Amino acid sequence: MIGSLTGIIEEIYNNYIILNVGNVGYIIYVSHKVLQSCKTGNNIKLYIETYVNRDNLTQLYGFLDKQEQDYMRMLVTINGINHKTAISILSKLSPEQIFSAVVSNNKNAFRGNGIGEKLAGRITTELQYKISKMPIEETLIIKEDDSLAALISLGYDKLKAFNAIQEIKANFPDDSIQEIIRKALQKLSQ
């Protein structure tokens, strides 16, 4: 297994790059987010997910950060989602957007690229359970904001607390963390 690769980007294609590591060119499939940050000749470090397909061919998938890799791992555990489908989802949605779509039960966020209504519903349902079991820092909810952690430490459900915070932030974008927590407590105690 390969944990990460650091090398020089030799070539860039629609959904993969060729990364030169010690004069060996690796074909690494990446999301559009990764492709946008790639320039030929630049040095890059990618976290690698290795997959051996039905034809016994090894495919490498690369990620700029561990969170995107974790979401890829979660997505491929869902029946009907293979690595290529998962990378296409990650090309369309960031981990934060996936989290938001799951907690708000927005099945339409996943539709397209071969994902119909049924599979989108399965993704939403199965990820709700998986995300609720993740440690807080891995859910990528609000990195610079302690409001969610405060509500969870008070015993509130992670998904309900997140939804309350998102609603408050949408209606009161300039509120301080203290104000957000106060309003969320009021909302959650109703």
UniProtKB/Swiss-Prot annotation:
Gene name per UniProt: ruvA
Protein origin, superkingdom: Bacteria
Identification of the protein by name: Holliday junction branch migration complex subunit RuvA
Location of the region described as Domain II in the Swiss-Prot/TrEMBL record: 65-142
Stretches for region Domain I: 1-64
Region Domain III: start-end pairs: 143-190
Family: Belongs to the RuvA family.
Any GO CC annotation of this UniProt entry: Holliday junction resolvase complex
Subunit structure: Homotetramer. Forms an RuvA(8)-RuvB(12)-Holliday junction (HJ) complex. HJ DNA is sandwiched between 2 RuvA tetramers; dsDNA enters through RuvA and exits via RuvB. An RuvB hexamer assembles on each DNA strand where it exits the tetramer. Each RuvB hexamer is contacted by two RuvA subunits (via domain III) on 2 adjacent RuvB subunits; this complex drives branch migration. In the full resolvosome a probable DNA-RuvA(4)-RuvB(12)-RuvC(2) complex forms which resolves the HJ.
InterPro entries referenced in this protein's UniProt entry, alphabetically: DNA_helicase_Holl-junc_RuvA_I, NA-bd_OB-fold, RuvA, RuvA_2-like, RuvA_C, RuvA_C_sf
GO molecular function: ATP binding; four-way junction DNA binding; four-way junction helicase activity
Keyword terms: Cytoplasm, DNA damage, DNA recombination, DNA repair, DNA-binding
First-listed, main subcellular location of the protein, grouped into a coarse class: cytoplasm
Gene Ontology biological process: DNA recombination; DNA repair
Subcellular location field: Cytoplasm
Function: The RuvA-RuvB-RuvC complex processes Holliday junction (HJ) DNA during genetic recombination and DNA repair, while the RuvA-RuvB complex plays an important role in the rescue of blocked DNA replication forks via replication fork reversal (RFR). RuvA specifically binds to HJ cruciform DNA, conferring on it an open structure. The RuvB hexamer acts as an ATP-dependent pump, pulling dsDNA into and through the RuvAB complex. HJ branch migration allows RuvC to scan DNA until it finds its consensus sequence, where it cleaves and resolves the cruciform DNA.
Keyword DNA-binding set for record: yes
Domain notes: Has three domains with a flexible linker between the domains II and III and assumes an 'L' shape. Domain III is highly mobile and contacts RuvB.
Region (Flexible linker): 143
